């Protein structure tokens, strides 16, 4: 994994996030909070363990994992998923699986920004973060 992912990132733009949350099955009240949040994402690495912590005024989440190894995750909207993160062509690719559903979250670096593409079925959301 590129060390350029490491550090603190702040959300600067978000496109189609509400539609993505709807596709995930997130309720209206939680979607409203999610749309208001401007989360900070802190990515760190210790040995071969990567940690991604997401902080917002409404909820904080944290996942720690080894690339390619499945782990249990409780998402910000309280889904219990089996998740796996891999590295391919410089992109951190996360797959979350639960109750027969699957969503992907791809994090890549573009012009010094972290571009996060979230996909559920045919709904795609793009969120852009800048390093703090």
From Swiss-Prot:
Pfam families: Lipocalin
UniProt GO cellular component terms: cytosol; myelin sheath; nucleus
Keyword Calcium: no
Keywords associated with the record: Acetylation, Cytoplasm, Disulfide bond, Lipid-binding, Transport
Disulfide bond positions: 118-125
Source species, domain of life: Eukaryota
Positions with a binding annotation for (9Z)-octadecenoate: 107, 127-129
Location in or out of the cell: Cytoplasm
Entry GO MF terms: cholesterol binding; fatty acid binding
Keyword presence, Cell membrane: no
Modified residues (N-acetylserine): 2
Biological process per Gene Ontology, one example term: fatty acid transport
Residues noted as binding hexadecanoate in the record, renumbered to the chain: 107, 127-129
SUPFAM superfamilies (alphabetical): Lipocalins (SSF50814)
Quaternary organization: Monomer.
Domain notes: Forms a beta-barrel structure that accommodates hydrophobic ligands in its interior.
Further details from the record: P2 protein and myelin basic protein together constitute a major fraction of peripheral nervous system myelin protein.
Function: May play a role in lipid transport protein in Schwann cells. May bind cholesterol.
Family per record: Belongs to the calycin superfamily. Fatty-acid binding protein (FABP) family.
Designated name of the protein: Myelin P2 protein
Species per Swiss-Prot/TrEMBL record: Bos taurus
């Amino acid at each position: 994994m590129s060390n350029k992912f490491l550090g603190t990132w702040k959300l600067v733009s978000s496109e189609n996030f509400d539609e993505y949350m709807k596709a995930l099955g997130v309720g209206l009240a939680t979607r409203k909070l999610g749309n208001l949040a401007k989360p900070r994402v802190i990515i760190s690495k210790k040995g071969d363990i990567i940690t991604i912590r997401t902080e917002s005024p409404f909820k904080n989440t944290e996942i720690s994992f080894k690339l390619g190894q499945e782990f249990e995750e409780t998402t910000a909207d309280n889904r219990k998923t089996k998740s796996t993160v891999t590295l391919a062509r410089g992109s951190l690719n996360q797959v979350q699986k639960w109750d027969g559903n699957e969503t992907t979250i791809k994090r890549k670096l573009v012009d010094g920004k972290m571009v996060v593409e979230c996909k559920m079925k045919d709904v795609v959301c793009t969120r852009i973060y800048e390093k703090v």
